[in-house]
Amino acid sequence: MELNPDVLYRNSHRLASQVSLDFKREIYDRINWKPRIIGIKGPKGVGKSTLLKQQIRAAFPDDSKVLYASLDHIWFNGNSLDDLVEYHYIHGGTHLFLDEVHKYKNWQWGIKNIYDNYPSMNVVFTGSSMLQIDEGNADLSRRATMNIINGMSFREYLAFEGILSWDKVSLDDILSRHMEIATEITNNVHVLDYFDDYLHQGYSPFYK
């Protein structure tokens, strides 16, 4: 077994330091980042990995106590999640951001072990496979706060492209002020000119 996970720490620092904070998915501000175990699940390509890196960069100026690791990294071919958690803990780590947990066999037991045996450790995990996340969730339901992230709305896409930034409009406002709202928007930009592009590529922000 080759335990030294320095490659993971170097990778974590590089990815978090290089991620942009210019645009964040709306769910970023809706997530409560305080619970000890936080899960984020959703389809591939909707920005889960970026959320983790943005939170590290924004919330941990000193990243010595935080580690981002994708569980499909080759390091896990010869080492276990338990190995990593123990190493991180004895070196003063307090936060783990675990990406692609569904790629790791029995991931749910690994996270349960962290919760039960490392009370000072905080974990945020993501998974793309909805079925596997849900199968494993029964044992985490009392421990993890789960969040669902979907693809970008057309409004998010326009903001992501720098075309138009517009606050969310409630259904009541749409029903009572739809003509006024539509006029305000179209006076700024002809949004339908960009709708085809959104349908082709805008749902998943990984295309940039």
What are these regions (language model features)?
Residues I40:
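Hydrophobic anchor at the beta1->P-loop junction of P-loop NTPases
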Residues Q108-S129:
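Conserved catalytic/switch belt of AAA+ P-loop NTPases
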Residues K44-G45:
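Walker A (P-loop) phosphate-binding loop of P-loop NTPases
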Residues L15-W33:
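Pre-Walker A adenine-sensing motif
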Residues E2-D6, N11-L15, G136-K208:
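Interdomain motor-coupling "hinge/lid" segment immediately C-terminal to the ATP-binding subdomain
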Residues F97, N122-S128, I148, Y157:
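Structural recognition of the conserved hydrophobic beta-strand(s) that form the central parallel beta-sheet
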